[in-house]
Amino acid sequence: MTTFHVAGFPRVGAKRELKFAQERYWRGEIAEQDLLEIAQKLREINWKHQAAANADFVAVADFTFYDHILDLQVATGAIPARFGFDSQNLSLNEYFQLARGNQTQFAIEMTKWFDTNYHYLVPEFTKNTEFKANPAHYVQQIREAKALGFKFKPTIVGPLTFLWLGKEKGEAFNRFELLAKLVPVYVEILNALVAEGAEWIQIDEPALAVDLPTEWIEAYKAVYTTLKEKVKAKLLLATYFGSVAEHAPLLKGLPVDGLHIDLVRAPAQLAAFEDYNKVLSVGVIDGRNIWRANLNQVLDVVEPLKAKFGENLWIAPSCSLLHTPYDLEVETQLKANKPELYSWLAFTLQKVQELRVIKTALEQGRGAVQAELDASQAAADARANSKEIHRPEVAERLANLPTDADKRKSPFAERIAKQNAWLNLPLLPTTNIGSFPQTVEIRQARAKFKKGELSVADYEAAMKKEIEFVVRRQEELDLDVLVHGEAERNDMVEYFGELLDGFAFTKFGWVQSYGSRCVKPPVIYGDVVRPEPMTVRWSQYAQSLTNKVMKGMLTGPVTILQWSFVRNDIPRSTVCKQIGVALSDEVLDLEKAGIKVIQIDEPAIREGLPLKRADWDAYLQWAGEAFRLSYMGVQDDTQIHTHMCYSEFNDILPAIAGLDADVITIETSRSDMELLTAFGDFKYPNDIGPGVYDIHSPRVPKAEEIERLLRKALNVVPKERLWVNPDCGLKTRGWPETIAQLEVMMEVTKKLRAELN
């Protein structure tokens, strides 16, 4: 027998049922009991799908109403004291307030779950954090699964990863010191699961795939010795998202009953675990991407392992399936329009069926599943040879780029002099990051146009009306460099994906980003080409309305890559450079059309950093090159802007400077300009526009707040190189606060200008 198991399933449901139920509950349209019943139904459906695929265990304790790390904060009693809630008797309403904030407390901070596009809620630890077990949420799920007759395996994030993912608050201390207090509470939680009949418990320690300090690594032995001694269940220690080969001696010596390793992200690490003498669970189906596996190739890897490990070989997805959409079969439109592409994909329900085939082949031989293996092989062969994917001219163009293709003609000092000569901007020039409010009217017009209820002419007229409105408001505010407002764009990545060859879109390919927010990433399946201009006519129209400078707006190659499902048959770096080269055609067309200030947004450049420091340089090298390729060939007097929004720059500043954008605008208001200090210390050479107010809130900042931030900025950046702008785009704001916020920004800028002049 070969054990097949899953670490977790998507929580939101095939049609985002959980999202819609949560939002109705928050609006007071359904009662708590209704939400609980919908959630229970979704869990039951998930378990039935796993059982139907012949899984030996169904995953329990993986379901959450918002986030699994928030659930763990509740289960360990580690919720922030500032809320004043009792973790032992937390209501569902209070649970949601932790995630979303309330009148007196801001929400728990959110950040990316390792290098995925899922966000978790960051635990807040203080020196005096006291832990207290409350496993009710997990116990409830086990009882439901038992009542339905399923054999189950709970999955819970382990104590070291849980601590690692948190942040210290208040008095200075090292959160590692809390480990001794946390482990006994884990023992209590795990024993509550054992009392419900859990024979195996999966404990996830993905932190093992990052650069952990030595004391953290060394703690694994003591922690797992304690857990094994005091918990009467078999423990499966799971790692994923990267290689843990360097820790193989430690992991193989831990007193656990099995290990799970990710062979999709790190196939080479298998060699380090082939002599393991307990259960080895191998993640052989990609839990993070949507491509169908070549099952013959997977069997080539696992059949020798079966011969060696026998019943101790387990098979699984590489990680939780939370990161993949639910079911390919509902994509009837994709199947009709792109049948070949459809045949290359596998969503969650298809992935568990792939594991069923592998399990059957290992138990009964390949002949027992020959038809499925043949279909898998045919899809793999078709994909390898498809004309739709492989366009020789794209590879040729990349191969023949001159060695200095990604370099500007002249250094910044010479370029900026030429730019200033024609731009003729005042000191502290003002601009916006790009988008303006997406009103109900804009969204309705776009929806009607997509459904065919609005003609091309009527849709374009509606968008032009909106663009004119945005231009006039900016003129009234007396901003210096204007934007067209992006009314025609649904999303900063999807918009470009729809206009570039090599991209496709699903209708129901939603994955959870956080809480009730889901995203539907584009699918990059083939070589990327820009068949025709994408933004030129909109920017040209906007420029025709005003004598002020109009800025063109594009999304950069790294962000498009990061926020998509990316093909896995060529390196990500190659895909990224293809996108950069395709965007360069757009940049040159904008320049030709008289748009000579062009912003290329890269909010996701930091997100792409590999988990291990040793791999950073290689990534930053190709990401930087792809960005620079996106503006290759522009004239010195064309001004390239970029925008970035996140809070940690210090460790990648040389790479940011290496992008060689003439102007960088960054999100800094919420960190009180702290970020700028790093730019100052580094002596960042080009122009900078630090955000002077937070666009995530409808609040209108006071003049003195913006003035204080700008004066702080002037202490770091020479006045000749300082721009003034909001933190980010204004898409999610309403018009009244947008105008009021920008009025304050302009008032303060003019006051300081007069003073500096």
UniProtKB/Swiss-Prot annotation:
EC number in record: 2.1.1.14
Residues where Zn(2+) binds: 643, 645, 667, 728
Positions bound to L-homocysteine: 433-435, 486, 601
Active site residues per record: 696
GO MF term list: 5-methyltetrahydropteroyltriglutamate-homocysteine S-methyltransferase activity; zinc ion binding
Listed transmembrane segments: none
SUPFAM superfamilies: UROD/MetE-like
Cofactor binding note: Binds 1 zinc ion per subunit.
Reaction it catalyzes: 5-methyltetrahydropteroyltri-L-glutamate + L-homocysteine = tetrahydropteroyltri-L-glutamate + L-methionine
Binding site for 5-methyltetrahydropteroyltri-L-glutamate: 16-19, 112, 517-518, 563, 607
A Pfam short name: Meth_synt_2
Annotated GO biological process: methionine biosynthetic process; methylation
Coiled-coil features, chain-numbered ranges: none
Names of the cofactor(s): Zn(2+)
Pathway it works in: Amino-acid biosynthesis; L-methionine biosynthesis via de novo pathway; L-methionine from L-homocysteine (MetE route): step 1/1
Keywords: Amino-acid biosynthesis, Metal-binding, Methionine biosynthesis, Methyltransferase, Repeat, Transferase, Zinc
UniProt xrefs under NCBIfam families: met_syn_B12ind, PRK05222.1
Biological role stated in the UniProt entry: Catalyzes the transfer of a methyl group from 5-methyltetrahydrofolate to homocysteine resulting in methionine formation.
Similarity comment text for this entry: Belongs to the vitamin-B12 independent methionine synthase family.
Identification of the protein by name: 5-methyltetrahydropteroyltriglutamate--homocysteine methyltransferase
Organism, scientific name: Pasteurella multocida (strain Pm70)
Classification of source organism: Bacteria, Pseudomonadati, Pseudomonadota, Gammaproteobacteria, Pasteurellales
Gene assigned in the entry: metE
